[in-house]
Amino acid sequence: MPRFRLDIEYDGSLFAGWQHQADQPSVQQAIEQAIEKFCGEAVRLRAAGRTDAGVHASAQVAHVDLAKPWPGDKVRDAVNAHLQAAGAHVAILKAAIVPDDFDARFSATGRHYLYRILNRRAPAALEKGKVWWVPKRLDAGAMHEAAKLLLGRHDFTTFRSTQCQANSPVRTLERLDVSRAGDMIEVRASARSFLHNQVRSMVGSLKRVGDGGWTEAELKAALEARDRAACGQVAPPDGLFLIGVDYP
């Protein structure tokens, strides 16, 4: 059976996350149902990142095995047609046959996330659901400097969910940048893999530095505590986007 790679974007606002949920809509389910309507096959997708409820993606990657070597453009267009008909806020950007040993999750060598903070007195209107609105002025420069403390290989127990199923809390954070453009603050994070809720936990703690609630030393102490209770506020899912996945 030929294996297809799917490049996907979606608005996570209306979904309970990527992964199948018993009684709530998921991105995975929406795409699998669209594929079944296209080719009559009940399939199971595997994705590079199992995003949480409310988290968006502009560059999610998944793979699926189909019975026929359909042209990639046909798969893309047909699945999109069924997604549109279902009213799902999901789009297949590209579909292509890949080697049988390609695995969207385990073949990935890097994942890239963007977190957007709307930092102004007025709430979000056009971007509601796509940003974290923080009305108090944040010092993005202080956030960026503090972020450097989290770079490299660390035990990120403080910054992972208590429900995280990863065998080890140790991860190597390759990038964590904070920048401001007008009222928008962007936090960009890159690593081979992330722990559950790690990016949102780091952003929430950096926000505490930005509003003067924490010093750099207090952020460092939180990291070194290796204690979930030491984490700052967990940023809401609205502002988080999976924006890239690397493969060899």
From Swiss-Prot:
Keywords: Isomerase, tRNA processing
Reaction catalyzed: uridine(38/39/40) in tRNA = pseudouridine(38/39/40) in tRNA
CDD domains assigned: PseudoU_synth_EcTruA (cd02570)
Binding site for substrate: 113
Gene3D superfamilies: Pseudouridine synthase I, catalytic domain, C-terminal subdomain (3.30.70.660), Pseudouridine synthase I, catalytic domain, N-terminal subdomain (3.30.70.580)
Enzyme Commission number, as recorded: 5.4.99.12
One annotated GO biological process: tRNA pseudouridine synthesis
Single GO MF descriptor: RNA binding
Superkingdom classification of source: Bacteria
Catalytic residues of the enzyme: 52 (nucleophile)
SUPFAM superfamilies: Pseudouridine synthase (SSF55120)
Family (UniProt): Belongs to the tRNA pseudouridine synthase TruA family.
Subunit structure: Homodimer.
Record's function text: Formation of pseudouridine at positions 38, 39 and 40 in the anticodon stem and loop of transfer RNAs.
Protein name: tRNA pseudouridine synthase A
